[in-house]
Amino acid sequence: VWEVLKKQTSKLTRHRCEICAGRGRRWPVECHEVWLYDDKTHTQTLVRLIALCPMCHKVKHIGLASVNGEFEEVRAHLMKVNQWPQQSTAEAYIARAFEIFEERSRHEWTLDISYLKQFGIDPATMKRPLAGTVRLLPVMSPISVLPNSDVPFVSEADFDPFDHIINNERVA
């Protein structure tokens, strides 16, 4: 099932990254899940699948990239895509994303993958235990690629390091 969804997502974007329009060296793009987090009900909802080049995908999982010794390269990509000349801008953004991640990791989350129904997948009958209550794992901390830093979020609650921006418009 995942292989089919991956290929479909890649094909829809003509095998280009939805954030930077780039392609990877070994394979063009990877499939990434976009989640909406409700911090009041602690519900994590799958809202979309997107195609990301391997570098943008590593930015989304910068904690894992750091563990793998790729932090500097990934931070440089984050800065390049967002046109941030100051390393301190990227560091502040990453620090804030980790703060939000750490706060969210203190809670148990209900996982809503009903999005998959549109592909003929019934989450209730899946063999793997995807639906239910989960805990976020700090090593896998996702982080977004944002447009230029002058694009404001509506409020602190609206800041979500887990969503992404396409063409300077926030996509949930």
Predicted segments, located by residue:
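A residue-identity detector for tryptophan
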Residues: 2, 27, 33-35, 84, ...
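A broad "ordered helical/assembly scaffold" signature
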Residues: 4-5, 33-42, 118-119, 132
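Histidine-centered nuclease catalytic patch
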Residues: 18-51, 60-68, 72
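A detector for short metal-coordination/catalytic motifs
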Residues: 47, 59-172
